[in-house]
A protein has these predicted regions:
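Short hydrophobic beta/alpha edge segments that flank linear recognition/processing sites
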Residues: 25-47, 68-78
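PDZ-domain C-terminal substructure recognizer with occasional recognition of PDZ-binding tails
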Residues: 54, 61-73
Length: 78
């Protein structure tokens, strides 16, 4: 099991905009280049990459939830 962690503190967004579908859902397959969400810091949005390959087992943060650097965002199983 691998954890995808927030690289920076801020607000985590699971979707690119309120009208669009989430980047990934539980059960989605990801690879290291897959964007799994965005973290907003001071009006700047930073992509969060999976950095691992596998299937999303759980999503630990709600859309628009506050995160700190190192917080677990998702769990991925190989």
């Amino acid at each position: 099991m691998s954890n995808i962690k927030s690289p920076i503190p801020g607000i985590f967004y699971r979707r690119p905009s309120p009208e669009e579908d989430p980047f990934v859902e539980v059960g989605s397959n990801v690879n290291p280049d897959t964007v799994i969400g965005l973290v907003e810091v001071m009006k700047s949005f930073h992509k969060v990459l999976a950095e691992v390959s596998g299937k999303v087992k759980s999503i630990e943060v709600e859309d628009e939830g506050m995160v700190r650097a190192g917080d677990i965002l998702m769990e991925v199983e190989p």
